């Protein structure tokens, strides 16, 4: 894997810097590294593909070295280099695709394609000169079963979940109280509602709670907490739990009271915030507990009192909500996030070449399914294919 990264890094630098008119002295070190790559690869043969509709291709290497010059690189020099670069780039691209479409239930962190296994041989280590990639660093750690650490921006840690619970219901669905939520990606939105605006609740206060368990532990997380849930701020028709009917939700938004968010690890509270909004941080957690209250306004103008009558019908439904968004965090496991395209890269290649469903990943690389059942085998394989996708993205956008 580290050899594949170094090949890709060398080729990217060569493609960017070996251009007509460049002083040879400015790229002499790169050309020496490029020539070392050619010397190491010459005389070797590889085969890629042969799975799904990914075609089988044979690769052989017999290229001349780039020479030295006292002046600028001319057109002939650059054309010779380009022909070599293009062949190598095509080879690396196909090795990456071949690796991205394979999976294994055992030792999925190790190379699975014959071409990458061959590149892992000791003779190719002479190419290895740059392992600065975070993915490569963590792949090497995971390969030795040492602790890894990925930094993510808006990590997709929450499987998609959209539902509701009713703490009070009537057959006519005209006086309901409960909680509804939408968890997806890096965001939780939860709303508590009471059609009667807590008129019969103790002290005219309704208490709500929403608990979310993560599939992986996050550390040093920067989080945004807002006293609102905009996705639940407009009227909607909702299917009943049994699917037999529908009920109408017509929210009027109030500010939540006594808001508390707890971050827990293995059942122990690590961080707690009360009535604090904006940016917060959490040190170490695998569970988030949100609690908040809906308080019936003690003093209301006539127009507000008309919204919340003392008896049915309740045409407007008092609602309070919270939004919690994980902006950045560190995780030992690889995740899809907002700043990278690894999941899309892997999924598109597997779809384009009609790769059959294997023993590890769900059909279509469905992320909700994958993260919901994030087994050690999936974790190993996902880290490997994401690492390869990061290497491929250096050359192929």
From Swiss-Prot:
Annotated segments matching region Interaction with the inner capsid protein VP2: 62-73
Annotated compartments: Virion
PTM comment, free text: The N-terminus is blocked. Sumoylated with SUMO1 and SUMO2. Sumoylation of viral proteins seems to have a positive role on viral replication.
Molecular function terms from GO: host cell surface receptor binding; metal ion binding; structural molecule activity
Protein family: Belongs to the rotavirus VP6 family.
Note: The VP6 trimer contains a zinc ion located at the center of the molecule. The zinc ion is not essential for either trimerization or transcription activity of the DLP. Zinc-depleted VP6 has an increased sensitivity to proteases.
Quaternary data: Homotrimer. Interacts with the inner capsid protein VP2. Interacts with the outer capsid glycoprotein VP7. Interacts with the outer capsid protein VP5*.
Protein name from the UniProt record: Intermediate capsid protein VP6
């Amino acid at each position: 894997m580290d050899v594949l990264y170094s090949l890709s890094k060398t080729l990217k630098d060569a493609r960017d810097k070996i251009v007509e008119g460049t002083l040879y002295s400015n790229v002499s070190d790169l050309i020496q590294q490029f020539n070392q790559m050619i010397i190491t690869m010459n005389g070797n043969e590889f085969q890629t593909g042969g799975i799904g509709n990914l075609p089988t291709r044979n690769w052989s290497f017999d290229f001349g070295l780039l020479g030295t010059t006292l002046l600028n690189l001319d057109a002939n020099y650059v054309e010779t280099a380009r022909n070599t670069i293009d062949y190598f780039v095509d080879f690396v691209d196909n090795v990456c695709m071949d690796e991205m479409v394979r999976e294994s239930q055992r030792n999925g962190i190790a190379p699975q394609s014959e071409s990458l296994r061959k590149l892992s041989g000791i003779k190719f280590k002479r190419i290895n000169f740059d392992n600065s990639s975070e993915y490569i660093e963590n792949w090497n750690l995971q390969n030795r079963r040492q602790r890894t650490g990925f930094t993510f921006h808006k990590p997709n840690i929450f499987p998609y979940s959209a539902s509701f619970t009713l703490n009070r219901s009537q057959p006519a669905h005209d006086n309901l109280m409960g909680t509804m939520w939408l968890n997806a990606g890096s965001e939780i939105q939860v709303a508590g509602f009471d059609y009667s605006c807590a008129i019969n609740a103790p002290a005219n206060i309704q208490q709500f709670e929403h608990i979310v368990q993560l599939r992986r532990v996050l550390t040093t997380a920067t989080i945004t907490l807002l006293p609102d849930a905009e996705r639940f701020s407009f009227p909607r028709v909702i299917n009943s739990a049994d699917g037999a009917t529908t009920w109408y939700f017509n929210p009027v938004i109030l500010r939540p009271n006594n808001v508390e968010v707890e971050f827990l690890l293995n059942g122990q509270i690590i961080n707690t915030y009360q009535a604090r909004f904006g940016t917060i941080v959490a040190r170490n957690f695998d569970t988030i507990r949100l609690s908040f209250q809906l308080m019936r306004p003690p003093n209301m103008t006539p127009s507000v009192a008309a919204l919340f009558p003392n008896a049915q019908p309740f045409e407007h439904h008092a609602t309070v909500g919270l939004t919690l968004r994980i902006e950045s965090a560190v995780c030992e496991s690889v995740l899809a996030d907002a700043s990278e395209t690894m999941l899309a890269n892997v999924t598109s290649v597997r779809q384009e070449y009609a790769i059959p469903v294997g023993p590890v990943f769900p059909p279509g690389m469905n992320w909700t399914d994958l993260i919901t059942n994030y087994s050690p085998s999936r974790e190993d394989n996902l880290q490997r294919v994401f690492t390869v996708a990061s290497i491929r993205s250096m050359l192929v956008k």
